[in-house]
Amino acid sequence: MTKPNYDALNVGDAIPSFTTEPVSRLTLALYATGSGDHHPLHLDQDYVRAKGIPDVFAHGMLGMAYLGRLLTQWVPQAAIRSFGVRFTAITQVGERLVCTGKVVEKLEQAGEKCVRLELTCANEQGEAKHKADAVVALA
C-alpha cells in the first residue's frame, strides 16, 4: 500500500469511500462470533419484540469496524495515531452503510506530518449511524 502524499492533500479532500453489502442477520451472527458480543438485541428476534423493538439491529462496534476498514484501505494501520467514534443512530437489518471521510486539517504532531479526518458511516439515505475523527501520519 502506498501512503497518500501529505503535500498533495488539501483540507476538504475526500478519501476513497466504500459501501457495505446490506447488513444481514448472518452479518450480525458472524460479527457476534468474532467479537464475542452475543447480546440478544443483535441476534434474538423474539427477545427484541418482547421489548417492543421491531427487529434486531447491528452492534455499534460493527460500524466502528467499518470505519476502521475505511482508514486501513487508505493508510497502513501503523499510520493511525488516533481514532475516536461516536454512535449516533441504530443500524437496521437490511441497510447498506456508506463510509466516507475527508481531510479537515493538516498538522504536524510529534515531528510527523499528519492529517485529521472526519469520517462518517451513514445509510444510503444519508442518516449518520457513526461519526468519527482520526489522525493519521503521512510522513
Regions found by a protein language model. Give the residues of each.
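HotDog/MaoC-like acyl-thioester-processing domains
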Residues: 1-15, 90-139
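Catalytic strand-loop segment that frames the active site of acyl-thioester-processing enzymes
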Residues: 1-56, 138
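A generic structural signal for short beta-strands and their flanking turns/coil linkers
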Residues: 19, 27, 37, 79-83, ...
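Short, intrinsically disordered, mixed-charge
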Residues: 33-36, 72-76, 124
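A broadly tuned preference for mixed-charge, low-complexity surface segments
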Residues: 43, 66-72, 118-123
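Hydrophobic beta-strand-centered segment that forms part of the acyl-chain substrate-binding groove
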Residues: 49-58, 62-103
